[in-house]
């Protein structure tokens, strides 16, 4: 029963991590495409809040429940699919802190534009591009992790099955 409870929490955390993360990402993209500093400042404030209070804790819950599930099943951390997913998770996590910082910076830049009555400058576009591409790579990693969790195979093992 403990295993099933942990697995349930692990899956819920994955849903929150992926769902809120993707939702935040898409909302800030949509807001930025308006080029309206007021819209961007408001959406970025909410995105920073949701990512800080929901998405980030979901990531910690993922790693804790994943570790407990591995311990409970007696599976070594060096099992190929486990180690691969853990490495990808850590890489995605390493992108996460800079993404949070960049989101906060985008919010501050948009708010400053609102307060001064100016339009967003090239500085905003540069920070936005970094944030955007870090998000692309982060979500690609998350898609791969979900595939690994479902199949219990590494990507190269799956490719080997297709060849």
Task: Please place each PLM-identified region on the residue numbering.
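Polytopic transmembrane helical bundles with strong interfacial aromatic enrichment
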Residues: 1-163
């Amino acid at each position: 029963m403990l295993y099933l409870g942990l697995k349930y929490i692990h899956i819920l955390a994955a849903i929150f991590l992926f769902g809120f993360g993707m939702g935040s990402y898409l909302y800030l993209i949509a807001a930025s495409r308006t080029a309206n500093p007021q819209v961007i400042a408001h959406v970025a404030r909410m995105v920073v809040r949701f990512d800080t209070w929901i998405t980030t804790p979901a990531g910690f819950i993922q790693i804790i429940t994943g570790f407990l599930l591995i311990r409970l099943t007696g599976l070594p951390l060096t099992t190929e699919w486990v180690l691969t997913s853990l490495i990808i998770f850590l890489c995605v996590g390493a992108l996460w802190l800079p993404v949070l910082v960049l989101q906060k910076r985008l919010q501050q830049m948009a708010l400053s534009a609102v307060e001064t009555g100016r339009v967003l400058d090239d500085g905003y576009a540069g920070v936005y591009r970094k944030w955007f591409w870090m998000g692309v790579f982060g979500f690609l990693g998350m898609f791969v992790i979900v595939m690994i969790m479902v199949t219990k195979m590494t990507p190269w093992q799956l490719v080997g099955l297709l060849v």
